[in-house]
Amino acid sequence: MYNLKKGLDIPISGSPDGSISDSTKISHVGVLGPDYVGMKPTMMVESGDKVNIGSKLFEDKKNPGIFYTSPATGTIKSINRGDKRRFISIEIEVSDEESQVEIYNDSNEAIIDNISKFGVINNFRTRPFNKTPKPNDIPEDIFINLCDTNPLSVDPYIYLHHEIDLFNKSLLKLKEIYKCNIHVCYQN
């Protein structure tokens, strides 16, 4: 175990209260290009298209088979591009009803296919270069980081504690599928 003696200490008062509130309805969400370093998108939607949670928005030209999906149900309001058509963002106007793409097959092969098909693989990173893995790459080990030490960051356990059984089942399924060690990093 490592203990850091020095670090960045920003004098900000207060901290997140550790609760999740349903008080505010979100009207728009965005998928931001700068969040995906080195990714070149091939758009699969246009302004005005209706999308569900998990609907494909675009595919990475550099890594065919890597899809980026919608975080909300709604209508594509705009696709924003910058200089030389660089991808800036997709804005989605959120609808009142929430629907998602349904997945019925739970075989190991189908799960591996769905990890890339529904954009889950974008949350995985290879080491040492922090790239999105190829869909057919088999990891030696998987590390799951539940530590966020950024100032005013929320403890990830707040989101997980309602679904901790599902999280644990997911870890066991990943271990079964990839036949590798799973390491979960968290703070006490």
Predicted regions and their residues:
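Short, charged beta-turn/beta-strand-edge "cap" motif at the junction between a beta-strand
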Residues: 56-65, 83
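N-terminal, Lys/Arg-enriched amphipathic/low-complexity engagement segments
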Residues: 1-44, 59, 91-93
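Short alpha-helical basic/polar micro-motif
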Residues: 49-52, 72, 165-169
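Short, compositionally biased
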Residues: 65-81
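Short, well-structured beta-strand-loop connectors
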Residues: 45-59, 78
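Buried, small/hydrophobic-residue-enriched core segments of structured protein domains
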Residues: 80-188
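Short, conserved secondary-structure segments in the cores of folded domains
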Residues: 41, 47, 64-67
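A generic structural signal for short beta-strands and their flanking turns/coil linkers
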Residues: 27, 70-72, 88
